[in-house]
Amino acid sequence: MYTKVLAAVDFSETSRSVLNAALRLTNDNPSRIHLIHVVQPVTEGYDLKVYTENFQALEDEAVEQAAARLKEFESSDKIPADQIYTVVGDRAGEIRRTCADIEADVIVIGSHGYSGQRRMLGTTANKLLHGAKCDVLTVHAGDPT
């Protein structure tokens, strides 16, 4: 049994399976689960130094919406509020950093996201599999968990 599980979610259908797998790894003890959602920077992929204020406002709004959605997503699972993280940055990098900060034993992540992010989350899972300092459990889209 793992004592600290970091579950990375993107609000896809697979995310519920990720959380269910995390619960199983902790014998249904939500106090051992840390939940993270990473928001990509609004300016990622652009080299724009103009309109930074507008992008910052958009990014702040995206973080607020993601945080509210994350709270709603986990509301029935009773994960402590101080163990729920909404961060901005590179998905794999932020998940690894949070994993190190909380000294997680395992990361649970979906192997595919939703819509246009399907390939990106696959890339994130791959980066974590090859760069994490702890165990990584990937939950495939469509797994009945």
PLM feature spans:
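A short acidic, glycine-rich active-site loop
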Residues: 53-65
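Gly/Ser-rich helix-loop-strand patches that form or flank binding pockets
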Residues: 98-145
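Active-site phosphate/pyrophosphate- and oxyanion-stabilizing loops and adjacent acidic/basic residues
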Residues: 23, 71, 126-127
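Small/aliphatic-rich secondary-structure junction motif
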Residues: 3-52
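Intrinsically disordered or low-complexity boundary/linker segments at protein termini
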Residues: 1-17, 79, 131-145
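Structural beta-alpha unit
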Residues: 74-107, 145
